Amino acid sequence: MTNFTTYLSTAPVVALIWFTFTAGLLIEINRFFPDPLVFSF
């Protein structure tokens, strides 16, 4: 039972770190290679 409670306490932490990394990666990709939604000629 302690292994299950340890899993419940660490899975949200791992998910938070993963989602933060993914969001930061997408933000940096869009900063250097912006989407062609707005064409500023």
UniProtKB/Swiss-Prot annotation:
Main localization, broad class: plastid
Subcellular location: Plastid, Chloroplast thylakoid membrane
Single Gene Ontology BP annotation: photosynthesis
Keywords: Chloroplast, Membrane, Photosynthesis, Photosystem I, Plastid, Thylakoid, Transmembrane, Transmembrane helix
Protein name: Photosystem I reaction center subunit IX
GO CC annotation, single: photosystem I
Keyword match Ribonucleoprotein: no
Natural source organism: Pleurastrum terricola
Bilayer topology term: Single-pass membrane protein
Family assignment from sequence similarity: Belongs to the PsaJ family.
Regions that span the bilayer: 7-27
Main function: May help in the organization of the PsaE and PsaF subunits.
Lineage of source species: Eukaryota, Viridiplantae, Chlorophyta, core chlorophytes, Chlorophyceae
Superkingdom classification of source: Eukaryota
